[in-house]
């Protein structure tokens, strides 16, 4: 039996602490060190019983971990991951993979040249609900996918914005939240060829959006829409519908994604599938509905188990750097479309 993987944690903010929570339950890996320059980081490391380093580069040199989780601020993701690769350390890199495509391309090139794996933390792909939904879609249960409706509608309280950077450009719901939904839409429905978008900050007046409407044209011919707002009293979002994170009260009967094709339709996260009976079709005929079964499991924990296998070179990353870069390219196309009022195509990502 393999000994537990020695995993270092770079960044002990909210996501870093969530990773530690799940790492404690993992027999395949254990926390070996913490790196974070914040004043409270040393105390957190002491509570966790591991050494603390203000500088992650010194930690990599002295501790020589088997793998590292990078969960520091977004603008440091690429530089920190590059330092890990230079030290020969596999990385679980929190989303977003980076802030700008140019730096992410640099990271993708470093992964290719070094052969050191990087798993990007779009953890919802690991959720059994999404695994089953993708199986149904790719297995032809919906026929030819035709339309996709995605909703992200909830209310962030005023206290959320007491942290100043959350009111600044680039820190709005597109990069912070909707990037998850865009990644799942790519994962479930395929690549997006073109987008149109409108964003608004009319509710709060901050320097970032509180409402967005996006039209998506998929490469397979399907058309989709994503409507989002973090300033509304509504139950339609992955956070509220899926029950994935217990800090949010679950609205289990409400969907956040509605996918329809020539042979059926699917609501997510309920996994409720609609179709006509054999030999009947058309709007005068009743639709049959069945809820697909799916074993519940914690996506972040499943992601960590997958990361251990990635670090040991047993499997390829479910979400590699180039894959995550395509989600970032889609997000950048949406921003450009909203700014210019024109349809925009996501940048091409090699690999």
Where are these regions (language model features)?
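Hydrophobic residues in well-ordered beta-strands that form the structural core
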Residues: 54, 93, 118-120, 149, ...
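Beta-loop-alpha module in the N-terminal Rossmann-like domain of NAD(P)-dependent dehydrogenases
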Residues: 19, 37, 48-110
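C-terminal helix-rich "cap/oligomerization" subdomain common to oxidoreductases
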Residues: 1-4, 67-70, 268-269, 306-351
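Predominantly a Rossmann-like dinucleotide-binding segment in NAD(P)-dependent oxidoreductases
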Residues: 117, 124-216, 223, 341
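N-terminal Rossmann-like dinucleotide-binding module
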Residues: 1-48
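Short, Asp-centered acidic motifs that coordinate Mg2+ and/or phosphate
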Residues: 33, 67, 147
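NAD(P)-dinucleotide binding in Rossmann-like oxidoreductases
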Residues: 205-209, 219-302
């Amino acid at each position: 039996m393999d000994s537990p993987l020695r995993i270092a944690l770079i960044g002990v903010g909210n996501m870093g602490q969530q990773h530690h929570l799940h790492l404690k339950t993992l027999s395949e890996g254990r926390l070996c060190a913490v790196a974070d320059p914040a004043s409270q980081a040393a105390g957190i490391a002491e509570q966790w019983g591991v050494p603390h380093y203000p500088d992650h580069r010194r930690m990599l040199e002295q501790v020589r971990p088997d793998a590292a989780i990078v969960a520091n601020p977004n603008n440091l993701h690429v530089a920190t991951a590059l330092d890990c690769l230079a030290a020969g350390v596999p990385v679980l890199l929190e989303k977003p993979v980076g802030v700008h495509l140019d730096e992410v391309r640099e990271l993708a090139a470093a992964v290719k040249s070094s052969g050191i794996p990087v798993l990007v933390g779009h953890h919802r792909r690991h959720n059994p609900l999404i695994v089953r939904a993708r199986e149904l879609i790719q297995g032809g249960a919906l026929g030819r996918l035709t339309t996709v409706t995605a909703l992200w509608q909830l209310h962030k309280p005023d206290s959320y914005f007491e942290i100043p950077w959350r009111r600044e450009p680039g820190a709005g719901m597109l990069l912070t939240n909707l990037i998850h939904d865009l990644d799942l839409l790519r994962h479930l429905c395929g690549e997006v060829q073109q987008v149109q978008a409108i964003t608004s900050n009319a509710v709060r007046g901050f320097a970032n959006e509180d409402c967005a409407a996006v039209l998506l044209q998929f490469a397979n011919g399907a058309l989709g829409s994503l409507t989002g707002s973090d300033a509304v009293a509504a139950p339609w979002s992955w956070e509220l519908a899926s029950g994935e994170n217990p800090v949010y009260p679950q609205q289990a009967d409400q969907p956040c994604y509605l996918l329809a094709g020539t042979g059926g339709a699917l609501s997510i996260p309920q996994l409720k599938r609609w179709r006509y009976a054999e030999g009947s079709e058309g709007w005068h005929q009743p639709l049959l509905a069945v809820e697909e079964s799916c074993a519940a499991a914690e996506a972040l924990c499943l992601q960590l188990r997958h990361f251990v296998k990635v670090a040991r070179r047993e499997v390829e990353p479910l979400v590699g750097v180039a894959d995550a870069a395509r989600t970032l390219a889609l997000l950048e196309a949406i921003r450009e479309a909203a700014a210019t009022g024109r349809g925009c195509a996501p940048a091409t990502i090699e690999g």
